[in-house]
Regions:
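Cytosolic, long alpha-helical scaffolding segments
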Residues: 1-178
Length: 178
């Protein structure tokens, strides 16, 4: 069915990201053996961290897909409020990811403030989602099982945002590392 097809696609992309990550890392290690100017060595070091961040985003995407499948297969129900919170957070994470990639690809520092602001919003959303979920559980609106999946999803989204910020700020000589 469609969900399984999506899972296979996400998993295949993650395997491809792992393959590329390995090859790119090998190339960068080889390139670093040559007498590169200091500026180039620093840039190469920054790119190495970007490769790691992209690979970790792929890992989180697979984890999120696993949680989504668990939700479906175990017939876990989220409250409307919880589902709305997750969808809102997902949208913000996609925004920060797209802006981070744009900053990195175009070396455009003009969007740093926007990425910083979005990171703060996402960090607060994680806290708000977790607190809201605890309140919903206490009120009997959702189960412990849904809580575990909900928490994993929210944490996964927030970690993707952190890696996206690292990618954006990698174009600076002094980086903001999350």
């Amino acid at each position: 069915d469609k969900e399984f097809s999506t899972y296979k696609e996400v998993y295949a992309r993650e395997k491809y990201i792992d393959f590329l990550s390995h090859g790119i890392t090998e190339y960068m290690v080889d390139a670093n053996r040559y007498g590169l100017p200091l500026k180039d060595k620093e840039r190469l070091g920054g790119l190495f961290h970007v490769v790691i961040d992209v690979e970790r985003i792929g890992d989180h995407a697979v984890n999120i897909m696993d949680d989504a499948l668990k939700e479906k297969n175990q017939k876990i129900e989220f409250s409307k409020e919880g589902r709305d919170e997750m969808l809102t957070m997902y949208g913000k994470v996609m925004d920060i990811y797209e802006k981070a990639v744009e900053i990195f690809v175009n070396e455009d520092k003009s969007k740093f403030d926007e990425v910083d602001r979005l990171e703060d919003v996402i960090d607060q959303m994680k806290i708000d989602c977790q607190e809201g979920h605890v309140k919903r559980m206490a009120a009997g609106k959702c189960s412990i099982e849904s809580g575990l999946v909900f928490t994993d999803l929210v944490i996964g989204y927030e970690r993707i945002a952190d890696h996206a910020v690292n990618i954006a700020f990698s174009i600076l000589p002094e980086k903001k590392i999350n």
